Amino acid sequence: ANFCAARCAKIVGVEYVPEAIDDAKVNSALNGIGNTRFYAGDMKAVLDDAFVAANGRPDVIILDPPRAGVDQPVIDVILRAAPERIVYVSCNPATQARDLALMDGAYRVEAVQPVDMFPHTHHVENVVKLVRR
């Protein structure tokens, strides 16, 4: 999230791995970034309507879920929060397609960019930009 901080009024990050949150906080401090807040935990336990109310409705959400994709309760909260844009990064195009179908009524795909981060393997990262309808 730190790479976006200069273009945003506020960054709120949620990550399952507590050590990654510790690193993000250190990187924010080292780079003089003061508009970030980070929370450790599983998205389906952390992200709810109260979390959105406490942290503000997002303009943009960047999703990078595990291989299993985004849990339905998380998608429901995202749809209620209604950000203008969603950037969905996925290592599993099948679960990404499933999740995109669940958001299709509220969002349209504006851009898709596969990224070959693991040459000579079948693995690909897929980045999709969604905009609210």
Segments and roles (model prediction):
Residues A1-R133:
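Rossmann-like S-adenosyl-L-methionine
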